[in-house]
Regions:
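Long, basic/Gly/Ser/Thr-rich N-terminal segments
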Residues: 1-74, 81-82, 86, 270-279
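Glycine-rich, often acidic-flanked micro-motifs
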Residues: 3-28, 39, 96-109, 124-130, ...
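Short, flexible segments with low predicted structural confidence
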Residues: 69-71, 77, 93-94, 223
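Pre-Walker A adenine-sensing motif
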Residues: 85-100
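Conserved glycine(s) of the Walker
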Residues: 113-115
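Post-Walker A alpha-helix
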Residues: 118-119
Length: 279
């Protein structure tokens, strides 16, 4: 039986698997999280008999014969369950986050806005990794790490080569699972070398937007009020708009600055950000 316990925010998550392939997959998916000696709040168990079952705290979540299918189900339930337990102590923002000079920079936006691409570029340039999807805002204005692996939906990425990722010290992992049509899909995971395991004070909030028609990146600074009106839509746990706005205003430090960047080339976007904000 393979076992491990890791921490996220103020909770611990326990994993155990009787299935060897599932254990390898779970180890890769959770490898960037720091070990914890706390009693787990959430315990995911994979059991093997005639088929394979996945359970959370004793309640069955999924059952099947394909280990990749079990791994895919685990990954979905893992992130949803963690966020559910962390809120409201932590506010989970749909945003990537990196550490720059021991301060947190958040890239918030909808899917395909380019936040993961900019996050990846910053990591290639030596920044510290906190998250590519879940930025956990504390009541003291810090971002807690949620370092799940970077994940490519395809074998290749339009902006980054495998060699670029490897040159930055990133390790590679993957798992395979059947899609809804029964076709085998490979999830390619990248494991950054520089991972931040302690919370960092939030300093920059950036709203990226990818636009293929833009000739050169455009960076603008926006008012705090404008940014706060936009941020609630990016919270994973929705509630009344006025309550979300009040919570964000109380938690985000007064010295934080807010920006938009419009870009079609992530490498040029990073050059502009570095020169304008991080020099």
């Amino acid at each position: 039986m393979w076992k491990r316990t890791f921490g996220v925010g103020h909770i611990a998550v326990g994993l155990e698997s009787e299935h060897r392939q599932c254990a390898r997959d779970l180890e890769a998916i959770t490898s960037l999280f720091a070990d914890s000696d706390k009693e787990p709040t959430l315990t995911f168990s994979i059991r093997q008999a005639d088929d394979i079952s996945l359970s959370l705290n004793g309640e069955e979540l999924w059952r099947g014969s394909d280990p990749g299918e079990i791994t895919a189900a685990f990954e979905v339930h893992l992130y949803v369950s963690i966020v559910h337990k962390l809120v409201p102590e932590l506010a989970s923002i749909h945003a990537a986050c990196v550490g720059i000079n021991n301060q947190a920079c958040v890239f918030a936006g909808v899917s395909d806005a380019g936040k993961s691409s900019i996050c990846t570029k910053t990591l290639l340039e030596g920044c510290d990794y906190l998250s590519d999807e879940f930025s956990l805002l504390t009541d003291t204005g810090e971002i807690e790490p949620f370092p799940r692996p970077l994940q490519w939906g395809k074998e290749e990425h339009p902006a980054f080569t495998h060699q670029m990722m490897q040159n930055a010290g990133m390790k590679q992992a993957s798992f395979k699972f059947p899609d809804r049509n029964g076709n085998i899909v490979t999830a390619l995971l990248w494991l950054p070398k520089r991972v931040q395991h302690k919370p960092l004070p939030l300093r920059w909030v950036i709203f990226p937007r990818y636009d293929a028609s833009v000739k050169a990146p455009e960076l603008t600074t926006i008012r705090r009020g404008e940014a706060l009106m936009e941020l609630p839509q990016h919270l994973h746990q929705q509630q009344r708009a006025d309550l979300m706005l009040q919570m964000l205003n109380q938690r985000i430090p007064k010295e934080a600055t807010f920006h938009r960047i419009l870009f079609n080339d992530v490498h040029e976007a990073w050059k502009l950000l570095k020169h304008s904000l991080f020099a």
